[in-house]
Amino acid sequence: MDNTTNINTNERSSNTDFSSAPNIKGLNSHTQLQFDADSRVFVSDVMAKNSKQLLYAHIYNYLIKNNYWNSAAKFLSEADLPLSRINGSASGGKTSLNASLKQGLMDIASKGDIVSEDGLLPSKMLMDANDTFLLEWWEIFQSLFNGDLESGYQQDHNPLRERIIPILPANSKSNMPSHFSNLPPNVIPPTQNSFPVSEESFRPNGDGSNFNLNDPTNRNVSERFLSRTSGVYDKQNSANFAPDTAINSDIAGQQYATINLHKHFNDLQSPAQPQQSSQQQIQQPQHQPQHQPQQQQQQQQQQQQQQQQQQQQQQQQQQQQQQHQQQQQTPYPIVNPQMVPHIPSENSHSTGLMPSVPPTNQQFNAQTQSSMFSDQQRFFQYQLHHQNQGQAPSFQQSQSGRFDDMNAMKMFFQQQALQQNSLQQNLGNQNYQSNTRNNTAEETTPTNDNNANGNSLLQEHIRARFNKMKTIPQQMKNQSTVANPVVSDITSQQQYMHMMMQRMAANQQLQNSAFPPDTNRIAPANNTMPLQPGNMGSPVIENPGMRQTNPSGQNPMINMQPLYQNVSSAMHAFAPQQQFHLPQHYKTNTSVPQNDSTSVFPLPNNNNNNNNNNNNNNNNNSNNSNNNNNNNNNNNNSNNTPTVSQPSSKCTSSSSTTPNITTTIQPKRKQRVGKTKTKESRKVAAAQKVMKSKKLEQNGDSAATNFINVTPKDSGGKGTVKVQNSNSQQQLNGSFSMDTETFDIFNIGDFSPDLMDS
């Protein structure tokens, strides 16, 4: 290509192979268009301004080399080709492109420098080769334009044009792999879901010359997809991988059902004779040797089918007879069918396939089975009997509800049987038949099964516990006394808790008796007295002046309304800063009439203290009552909570119905007081009380007998008593009023809103 005069003289060859050396031929003999060979202007990639001009230069060079003269002339007139010229060279002289470039003789030219308008310019390419990038792309464009897709190069060396062939052929049950041979008939093999492949489009990888049909690895490929010319084909051995089995699907279904029956239902096995007959049914027909004709094979298969049908009919007849006998001997279900769980297979979770249910004649063939309960057997036979008649749903095994321990299921059936026996016997059903097992027939027979021995022991244990539970009500009836306190009903429990809350509020000692004891009271010997409703007798009152005739009635705790309505109000009794005042009939042994208007709090019945007054000692002396007051004052000095003391009988008149209440409010801090001071304070308090009572008796004011003595403690420990007599009055409407200057009931403590509402 050093010669510029011979660059564009090669001709287009029949193939796409280009040689590096051009063909030297005359231009006038080829085309009417002439090159301006004497012109110094030519097309070259050396002086290209940009990539577009570089592309145009190569396209022009391609058109000239392949003798596309008209296209080259049109492209030269329209496209912006990079034109060059050589300066300083003789016209028509042989110059080298590389030498001219090195010497700086080349220059950029324009289309105005072209002398001949009809002639083509020569091309002088610095990078001109047959394997250039642009040349290869132009070859591809040419092949796409002409539609030359079936060339030998594309067919032999392009792997992308080969079709994708499936591994397994479509609809070939005879060539099913060995690991899919035991599938039930309702399971679709994976080959039936594959897309169909036609014979024309099937083409094996490669040319197929090394394809051996006798190889066991190639047995999945159907022989109709392979031509007889390609591969080594042995016609005699074709029966090895494609046997002619007309009843392959039926035998596979029977085989799978019977295998699952003996594999997963060990507890439901039948005797030896039906098992042998079913094992004969499992055996596949043995294929005769290949030299025997096909007619003999078909005859043998027909004979085997007839034998199998006869065996099935015999088994069905035997089973029907056995079921009829069982129906006459034992009635149909005693166990509730809804309470019996489904029994899943033991190994169904490992295979991942739901086992199919075998026919009914293969499940139960015996009347009695050693490893199965009679209740369970009767239930399954009942379900299968109604299933055949279309009355019951089919028996399905759940994979999730699997029993890991068969003893749990056996214990469930035994408990159901015992419950049914006890219910029927207690109801006096004359037509009832026991569903317990015959111990003499089952337990006396020696068995090597550990489960059978364990079941008999378990049944004995359950029966013993059941008999023991029967004797408990009889023992309860025979007992005359109860050692522990018995709460009869829920209301008495609430009342008992209400009584305990009252004691906690009064800071009194909690005992098992009904109410807190009075002073000098001896606790009864039997502290565990039951809190039960009943007639408890009239109370015994210590003070004869306050004694009333109380008729016997029901326990007052039954109709008592609870004092605390919610949790928050109940907690007020336990607050340390609380100074809680209780009504008198909760603290003393006296009885308050129900119609008394001076009581602020809700009143129980008159028999509120019957339980305590039965054991009290009646002391009517005034000295004993004074001693009681002194003891209560000692308790007030030691405790910071308010207490209530009952005055002596001399301080009240016989006509008064409400005793006097002396409330002592003490500071939180404990102070030590000498014995002499306490004695003096007691004497002063007693003298003042006696004087008050005498004045009231002289005046004859019965309404002013209701007074409250508030005795606060000062810093010196001396008790000062404020008597509120004149200001307290009995109102006309029956309410009790007090002077707010000396006694403010709302400032005593944090009263609960429930108490105020009541």
Curated annotation (Swiss-Prot):
The keyword Nucleus applies. Its main location: cytoplasm. InterPro entries: LisH (IPR006594). Residues 207-220, 345-355, 436-454, 587-600 have a biased composition (Polar residues). Residues 667-676 have a biased composition (Basic residues). GO terms for cellular component: cytoplasm; nucleus. It is found in: Cytoplasm; Nucleus. Transcription factor that regulates pseudohyphal differentiation, invasive growth, floculation, adhesion and starch metabolism in response to nutrient availability. This is Transcription activator MSS11. It comes from Saccharomyces cerevisiae (strain ATCC 204508 / S288c).
